[in-house]
Amino acid sequence: GCGKPFCFNTIMARLRARGKVVLAVAATGIAALQLDGGKTVHTGLRIPLDPCGNRRGIFAIPITKNSALGRLIMNDIDLIVWDEAPMTHRDIFDSLDDTFKKLRNDSRPFGGVSIMLGGDFRQCLPVIRRATCAQQTAASIRHSTVFNAFGVVHLITNVRVELCKLRDPSRSQKLNEWAEELLRIGDGEYLVNESESSPFESRLPAIVHSKAIETKDDVFSMIYSLFGDLAELSTMDPRELIKQEAMYSAVLCPLHVSVDFVNRCC
């Protein structure tokens, strides 16, 4: 919530207005949609997909000198903006570094191409199937051979929280506690035995206490317990709807298949 996409888009708009060539990519499609002209890194930089997770070490990236992307990288590119970079495997980073050096015949990191990374190492790391903590950490771009070439700038103001506080000043204290608690979780400082003083609230429906959620009826009961009558909520004035407890509730699912099941039921 610190406004990374806003910063990226502002910088890109300024550079493009001056005639500079900026390529915007992101590790995920959702993150790419938040960038002006953004693409996934696999589309924008021709990174081959590795759905089985069998790839290891530096690999070939199919960018040739005669291709449009190759000519762009060799001659025209001024900046690459790369959002959610911590989700990227270090092998992708090292392979791109190797490819750019060969394309540009330049031994500097990434062949001298300026790259701006964005992301939060407290959040998602590369997805490694059945990995240990050590393997997960080793896959991070922080262990890339070129990571030390980057300077680091920290965004420390949670803009999303500040905007919420402006809309509802009465919730300022609770929002501040919530933001601080998130940082503590990300930094590994959250202790389970402190849960009684946590600003997080869990409202488990009675059905969750008594049985597993397995059928459509179970899902309907859970949704009704948490959110009430959805048909009634859909007809409410937005100014009244924002005051409802349902607006600050969520159903957390451990697996994608669970999310799909709940969505199909609703």
Which ranges hold each PLM region?
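RecA-like helicase/translocase P-loop NTPase motor core
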Residues: 1-266
